[in-house]
């Protein structure tokens, strides 16, 4: 999908897509000719061009839009670089705490298959000692969103859990391309620090 605005109707226009990194796209450069309807003056939002092609997941591209109007004036080309094409859903693995496990501190171990834009870690009391602040919606921030495994970490915004409470941990998120992750749940986690 592309977004673009044309100030006037064009006689000719093309979008050139060049693979500049990530996975190799052997078809690069790809030249996509715009159709007559796609060359009319106006704004185009989230548009799938008629002659578009499937790109390669995990490739990085540069897009350049060129055009000529009916008087054969050449428009200034417009280029957008470093477009990371990503259609793969990220995977979150919550390693610690484990379902039916116990914790004596707010340590968690998790693994992200790729860097996340945002994650939601919700810790909800489901039994044991009452926790009047439950559910805890934990904001995972900055370096905590990086791809890879994080071992036995106390998340920056970790809540204070209640001794003797039993919790459900639910972890989900979206990657930099807004692909939604799986939802991972660990039920019946006892917090016991005495």
Predicted features by range, described:
Residues 1-2, 104-108:
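Structural beta-strand segments of beta-rich domains
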Residues 7-12, 112-118:
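Short proline/glycine-enriched turn/loop motifs at strand-loop junctions of beta-rich domains
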Residues 38-50, 141-155:
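Aromatic sugar-binding surface patches on proteins
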Residues 52-60, 156-166:
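Surface-exposed, short loops/turns at beta-strand junctions within beta-sandwich domains
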Residues 65-67, 171-173:
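Conserved structural position at the C-terminal beta-strand
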Residues 71-78, 177-184:
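Beta-sandwich strand segments
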Residues 79-93, 175, 185-194:
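Flexible, low-complexity linkers/stalks enriched in Thr/Pro that connect modular domains
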Residues 98-104:
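Short, solvent-exposed loop/linker segments at the N-terminal edge
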């Amino acid at each position: 999908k592309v977004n673009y605005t044309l100030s006037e109707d064009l006689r000719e226009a093309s979008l050139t897509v060049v693979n500049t990194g990530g996975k190799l796209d052997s078809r690069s450069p790809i030249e996509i000719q715009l159709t007559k309807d796609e060359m009319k003056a106006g704004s185009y939002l989230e548009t799938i061009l008629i002659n578009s092609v499937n790109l390669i997941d995990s490739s990085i591209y540069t897009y350049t839009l060129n055009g000529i109007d009916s008087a054969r004036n050449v428009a200034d080309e417009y280029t957008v670089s470093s477009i990371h094409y990503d259609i793969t859903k990220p995977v979150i693995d919550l390693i610690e705490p484990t379902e039916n496990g116990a914790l004596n501190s707010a340590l968690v171990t998790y693994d992200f298959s790729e860097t996340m834009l945002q994650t939601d870690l919700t810790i909800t009391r489901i039994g044991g000692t009452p926790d009047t602040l439950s559910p805890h919606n934990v904001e995972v921030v900055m370096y905590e969103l990086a791809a890879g495994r994080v071992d036995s970490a106390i998340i920056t915004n970790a809540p204070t859990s209640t001794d003797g409470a039993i919790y459900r941990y639910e972890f989900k998120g979206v990657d930099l391309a807004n692909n939604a992750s799986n939802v991972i749940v660990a039920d019946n986690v006892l917090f016991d620090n005495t």
